[in-house]
Amino acid sequence: MSRDRSSLFKKSRRLGFSVLENEKEFNKGKKRNYAPGQHGQRRTKLSDYGLHLYEKQKVKNLYGVNERQFANSFKKSSKLKGVQGTNFLQFLEQRLDNLVYRAGFAETRRQARQFVNHGHVLVDGKKVDIPSYRVAVGKVIEIKEKLQKNAQVLRNKEIRTAADWLSVKDFKATFTRLPERNEFLKEVNDSLIVEFYNK
Protein backbone atom coordinates (compact mmCIF):
# COMPACT_ATOMS: atom_id res chain seq x y z
CA MET A 1 0.00 0.00 0.00
CA SER A 2 1.33 3.43 -0.90
CA ARG A 3 2.21 5.76 1.95
CA ASP A 4 2.43 9.51 2.13
CA ARG A 5 6.06 10.15 3.13
CA SER A 6 5.83 13.95 3.15
CA SER A 7 7.01 15.82 6.22
CA LEU A 8 4.44 15.99 8.99
CA PHE A 9 5.66 19.47 9.83
CA LYS A 10 5.14 20.72 6.28
CA LYS A 11 1.78 18.99 6.00
CA SER A 12 0.50 20.39 9.29
CA ARG A 13 1.80 23.86 8.48
CA ARG A 14 0.17 23.79 5.06
CA LEU A 15 -3.19 22.69 6.49
CA GLY A 16 -2.94 25.07 9.44
CA PHE A 17 -3.43 22.54 12.25
CA SER A 18 -1.65 19.67 13.98
CA VAL A 19 -2.16 16.42 12.05
CA LEU A 20 -0.96 14.54 15.15
CA GLU A 21 -3.46 16.50 17.30
CA ASN A 22 -0.76 17.16 19.91
CA GLU A 23 1.33 19.90 18.21
CA LYS A 24 4.48 17.72 18.46
CA GLU A 25 5.38 18.07 14.81
CA PHE A 26 5.91 21.78 15.51
CA ASN A 27 8.38 21.17 18.35
CA LYS A 28 11.51 21.34 16.18
CA GLY A 29 10.65 24.78 14.91
CA LYS A 30 8.46 27.68 15.83
CA LYS A 31 4.91 27.30 14.58
CA ARG A 32 4.13 29.97 12.02
CA ASN A 33 0.70 31.45 11.51
CA TYR A 34 1.11 31.60 7.75
CA ALA A 35 1.47 29.21 4.86
CA PRO A 36 4.85 27.73 3.86
CA GLY A 37 6.93 29.17 1.05
CA GLN A 38 8.56 32.49 0.25
CA HIS A 39 5.21 34.22 -0.07
CA GLY A 40 3.36 32.28 2.59
CA GLN A 41 2.03 35.44 4.21
CA ARG A 42 0.01 36.18 1.08
CA ARG A 43 -2.39 33.26 1.50
CA THR A 44 -5.34 34.00 -0.76
CA LYS A 45 -8.97 33.38 0.07
CA LEU A 46 -10.00 29.86 -0.87
CA SER A 47 -12.54 29.30 -3.61
CA ASP A 48 -15.70 27.30 -2.92
CA TYR A 49 -13.99 24.20 -4.31
CA GLY A 50 -10.88 24.98 -2.26
CA LEU A 51 -12.90 25.11 0.96
CA HIS A 52 -14.45 21.70 0.24
CA LEU A 53 -11.07 20.22 -0.70
CA TYR A 54 -9.41 21.66 2.40
CA GLU A 55 -11.98 20.04 4.71
CA LYS A 56 -11.53 16.71 2.97
CA GLN A 57 -7.73 16.92 3.22
CA LYS A 58 -7.98 17.88 6.89
CA VAL A 59 -9.93 14.74 7.84
CA LYS A 60 -7.96 12.48 5.49
CA ASN A 61 -4.71 13.54 7.14
CA LEU A 62 -6.08 13.35 10.68
CA TYR A 63 -6.97 9.69 10.22
CA GLY A 64 -3.86 9.00 8.15
CA VAL A 65 -5.62 7.30 5.25
CA ASN A 66 -4.85 7.52 1.55
CA GLU A 67 -7.19 8.88 -1.10
CA ARG A 68 -8.54 5.48 -2.16
CA GLN A 69 -9.30 4.39 1.42
CA PHE A 70 -10.94 7.72 2.17
CA ALA A 71 -13.19 7.60 -0.90
CA ASN A 72 -14.10 3.95 -0.29
CA SER A 73 -15.01 4.70 3.32
CA PHE A 74 -17.29 7.50 2.17
CA LYS A 75 -18.93 5.24 -0.41
CA LYS A 76 -19.57 2.46 2.11
CA SER A 77 -20.84 4.80 4.82
CA SER A 78 -23.20 6.45 2.32
CA LYS A 79 -25.23 3.23 2.27
CA LEU A 80 -26.02 3.51 5.98
CA LYS A 81 -29.19 5.07 7.36
CA GLY A 82 -28.90 8.41 9.10
CA VAL A 83 -27.01 11.66 8.57
CA GLN A 84 -24.43 11.13 5.84
CA GLY A 85 -21.66 13.27 7.30
CA THR A 86 -22.02 11.79 10.79
CA ASN A 87 -22.12 8.26 9.38
CA PHE A 88 -18.91 8.90 7.48
CA LEU A 89 -16.95 10.19 10.46
CA GLN A 90 -18.30 7.39 12.66
CA PHE A 91 -17.18 4.93 9.98
CA LEU A 92 -13.64 6.33 10.20
CA GLU A 93 -13.80 6.21 13.99
CA GLN A 94 -14.39 2.46 13.77
CA ARG A 95 -10.97 1.86 12.23
CA LEU A 96 -8.86 -0.36 14.47
CA ASP A 97 -5.87 1.98 14.47
CA ASN A 98 -8.10 4.88 15.47
CA LEU A 99 -9.65 2.95 18.37
CA VAL A 100 -6.21 1.93 19.66
CA TYR A 101 -5.43 5.66 19.65
CA ARG A 102 -8.77 6.63 21.22
CA ALA A 103 -8.24 4.07 23.99
CA GLY A 104 -5.07 5.90 25.00
CA PHE A 105 -2.71 3.02 24.17
CA ALA A 106 -0.90 5.09 21.51
CA GLU A 107 0.18 8.72 21.50
CA THR A 108 -0.87 9.27 17.89
CA ARG A 109 -2.86 7.44 15.22
CA ARG A 110 0.40 6.92 13.37
CA GLN A 111 1.86 5.09 16.37
CA ALA A 112 -1.36 3.10 16.75
CA ARG A 113 -1.10 2.08 13.10
CA GLN A 114 2.42 0.77 13.76
CA PHE A 115 1.20 -1.29 16.72
CA VAL A 116 -1.48 -2.88 14.54
CA ASN A 117 0.85 -3.46 11.58
CA HIS A 118 3.37 -5.22 13.81
CA GLY A 119 0.75 -7.61 15.18
CA HIS A 120 0.57 -6.21 18.72
CA VAL A 121 -3.23 -5.81 18.78
CA LEU A 122 -5.99 -8.37 19.38
CA VAL A 123 -9.71 -8.04 18.64
CA ASP A 124 -11.81 -10.45 20.72
CA GLY A 125 -8.66 -12.45 21.39
CA LYS A 126 -7.56 -12.77 17.76
CA LYS A 127 -4.64 -10.94 16.18
CA VAL A 128 -5.65 -8.34 13.61
CA ASP A 129 -2.86 -6.58 11.72
CA ILE A 130 -4.99 -4.48 9.37
CA PRO A 131 -5.20 -0.84 10.55
CA SER A 132 -8.34 -0.18 8.48
CA TYR A 133 -10.19 -3.15 10.04
CA ARG A 134 -13.67 -1.94 10.98
CA VAL A 135 -14.42 -2.76 14.61
CA ALA A 136 -18.05 -3.48 15.50
CA VAL A 137 -19.65 -2.11 18.66
CA GLY A 138 -19.22 -4.59 21.50
CA LYS A 139 -15.82 -5.86 20.36
CA VAL A 140 -12.86 -5.90 22.75
CA ILE A 141 -9.49 -4.50 21.69
CA GLU A 142 -6.43 -5.66 23.58
CA ILE A 143 -2.74 -4.87 23.52
CA LYS A 144 -0.58 -8.01 23.49
CA GLU A 145 1.29 -8.80 26.70
CA LYS A 146 4.71 -8.17 25.17
CA LEU A 147 3.82 -4.57 24.27
CA GLN A 148 2.16 -3.95 27.64
CA LYS A 149 5.64 -3.67 29.17
CA ASN A 150 6.76 -1.08 26.64
CA ALA A 151 7.71 2.17 28.40
CA GLN A 152 6.05 4.31 25.74
CA VAL A 153 2.76 2.42 26.00
CA LEU A 154 2.83 2.70 29.80
CA ARG A 155 3.47 6.43 29.50
CA ASN A 156 0.61 6.80 27.01
CA LYS A 157 -1.79 5.17 29.46
CA GLU A 158 -0.70 7.57 32.18
CA ILE A 159 -1.05 10.81 30.24
CA ARG A 160 -3.90 10.07 27.82
CA THR A 161 -7.60 9.73 28.58
CA ALA A 162 -9.74 7.19 26.76
CA ALA A 163 -12.72 8.37 24.72
CA ASP A 164 -16.15 8.13 26.37
CA TRP A 165 -17.30 5.48 23.88
CA LEU A 166 -14.63 3.07 25.05
CA SER A 167 -14.53 1.22 28.37
CA VAL A 168 -10.88 0.64 29.24
CA LYS A 169 -9.51 -1.67 31.92
CA ASP A 170 -5.79 -2.32 32.03
CA PHE A 171 -4.83 -3.05 28.41
CA LYS A 172 -8.29 -3.98 27.17
CA ALA A 173 -10.80 -1.57 25.64
CA THR A 174 -14.42 -2.43 24.91
CA PHE A 175 -16.02 -0.46 22.08
CA THR A 176 -19.30 0.25 23.87
CA ARG A 177 -21.03 2.54 21.36
CA LEU A 178 -20.62 4.82 18.38
CA PRO A 179 -19.66 8.37 19.36
CA GLU A 180 -22.22 11.14 19.04
CA ARG A 181 -21.32 13.78 16.48
CA ASN A 182 -20.82 16.45 19.15
CA GLU A 183 -18.27 14.29 20.97
CA PHE A 184 -15.46 14.33 18.40
CA LEU A 185 -13.85 16.44 15.67
CA LYS A 186 -16.01 19.44 16.49
CA GLU A 187 -13.76 21.61 14.33
CA VAL A 188 -14.62 19.58 11.21
CA ASN A 189 -17.43 20.68 8.90
CA ASP A 190 -18.48 17.27 7.59
CA SER A 191 -21.17 18.75 5.35
CA LEU A 192 -18.41 20.18 3.12
CA ILE A 193 -16.99 16.68 2.64
CA VAL A 194 -20.44 15.32 1.76
CA GLU A 195 -20.91 18.11 -0.77
CA PHE A 196 -17.43 17.45 -2.21
CA TYR A 197 -18.26 13.83 -3.03
CA ASN A 198 -21.87 14.41 -4.04
CA LYS A 199 -21.09 17.08 -6.63
From Swiss-Prot:
GO terms for biological process: ribosomal small subunit biogenesis; translation. SUPFAM superfamilies: Alpha-L RNA-binding motif. Keywords: Ribonucleoprotein, Ribosomal protein, RNA-binding, rRNA-binding. Residues 94-157 form the S4 RNA-binding domain. CDD domains: S4. InterPro entries: Ribosomal_uS4 (IPR022801), Ribosomal_uS4_bac-type (IPR005709), Ribosomal_uS4_CS (IPR018079), Ribosomal_uS4_N (IPR001912), S4_RNA-bd (IPR002942), S4_RNA-bd_sf (IPR036986). It holds the Pfam family Ribosomal_S4. One of the primary rRNA binding proteins, it binds directly to 16S rRNA where it nucleates assembly of the body of the 30S subunit. With S5 and S12 plays an important role in translational accuracy. Belongs to the universal ribosomal protein uS4 family. Part of the 30S ribosomal subunit. Contacts protein S5. The interaction surface between S4 and S5 is involved in control of translational fidelity. This is Small ribosomal subunit protein uS4. It comes from Mycoplasmopsis pulmonis (strain UAB CTIP).
